[in-house]
């Protein structure tokens, strides 16, 4: 966020505030760390920021290093920088500058910490986060240095508790979080052990007043060591030599009698840990109070979630293909690395320029907004948002065509002649699901699974062919061929009654509300329970558009802003609003059509815009044969850009009294009542898998979206900041889009896109079976390749990697980025500690596995592979990585 005072000036201002506090300080040693806050954008277009880092900024930092060389070693200038910008500097700096930078790294004047940059961790996924540590690891290894044991996040107020799990399992010992000075902070101690869902504990220093810390400790600081982080403002670079010396002298002045040395965050950890500090343990997730900003780019967010899976599924598929006897014709690891980097950059916390900077238009609404936009006054700021979206577009261009080609090559390689469809399962357990192939080729009435001999029915509608693919091996494939044989099928349970507006299958019976185009009743036929709360203020499967009032945006700003009101209100409130009242709108009087085929029954609701809601949109509700889920698809056509604060939701009010909620968040399933740290976001958050809504008997309903991670419980949560909110009603709201941020996220949402949602019943709740497994199967659909012609030489079916425990994920299987060989990474998500047997494909050449941490460092004794399998004990929610030897 924009500050009207430089980082160094802020540091010196804080100095005067703490001077009176430090006379009786017990501190014997102060480690001074210098850093600048890195935004990929915000102060300028991101390309310009990247250029400046590799040119003027690093040259200025080298100058400060050179001028300090005559000082004692512990007084020489040392500059801490994140992994990714240092990677950019090394790759883009001029040759002579690059050599100087490399030498400064080896000499310890440039210090690279473990994380790539400040991220909104909640927007990411498990494997992209792991890969994001690779930039710093590679730089350290190239310089012959140990891997960094320190890490830093700045600006973003709160983070997913995946951080202590991930960093600890990567060998990192210390994390510093510096909060934006205007934003509310989680209620945590200054220094504490942060315990992750796997019970890993990470020493964490949370400073709520600014990016860095104060130059001297507060009065109640109980330790002999203090960390003074002098962090200059957004992209402002390293201090000059004169500023550097002034800052160090200021620290000495404020800590009389203490030894003051310039160093790293790791130096602070290594010193204070010798004191055996008595620290409070905080076990809890801290939902991000900024995370709603990602849903200002709903299409890109949807694609990012797909790419977070498909990118690493591609590498696993390529690795397996080599074992099966067909090496890829393309450099798959290089494509994966570039896609992973783009995903990381999308998860980086900066989006674009801010309206408050005055560099592109100003806040206007209605006709005035349309006029300014037509004249091009917003072109500069809109391009900055486009830069952010291009990271996702770039990954799509890399990954999606390669996945398509690889699947076609697999289909061509199998020893089956003629038309054939190959179905690949990217998950490490056998599964069944429906697949879709688009082809104009002629097919007979059924398909045969070559491996099992099963005959399955097909539905062919012009160029769209669908069928149920059963018994697809874990991370393996099966081949299907056209046949004239009749499929043996039981009587269909699919039906609809247009007059009564009803449809059903074996598992569910749905009755629609014709007036509102929503679900009036949804019966879970297995439990005979009604899912829908008919008395709710919201309808089930209802699209809701909110237009907020100035009273609401102002209340949010007053609740959330903790300091700097004069500038922070412009970036966290919404200026120039008039007194137009709050409005909540939904479509009505939909056109309803039903259809049925051998695999599904569908109701389509089409809504035309009117004076109350100007959007044209549709809702599609589908039940499938032999599939215990309800599919809901929302689709909007030509949404206009709207600068007025707004949000769109799909509501699901469930018929449960006194509900319990289970949220499948990043790294673990959590209880929002017990596991959220106060002061973080209790009103709105992201999920990674799914949601459970349970009654007192641990029975109820599950739901997820592969496209929409943002949701609120009980009531819609945009423009709300609550310190003690506890959801009471069994309502789940998925956030389709919003433009709440007035800072640097996209400020108006427009266009056409879709979002899917899935609902199922829960009989006996367990994290794995109720949430993780169904959600992962939805996020990782079966992959299909089609070809025709001569047969290849590869088997018609092959097994891949399997795990004995469903819900243990294989997040990576491919080339070791930290050394020789291949790596396989498991991640326990069932929330239970148990042994897990991992079975590798036939014909693999691996003899043993070497346990390692998330950065490839060996951690234990080799484990022999016997009969293509090895067994390990994995703790609940823990990652486990192995080098295959």
Language-model features, listed with the residues they occupy:
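Bacterial Sec-dependent N-terminal signal peptides
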Residues: 1-23
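CE4/NodB-like, metal-dependent polysaccharide N-deacetylase domain
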Residues: 130-169, 217-231, 870
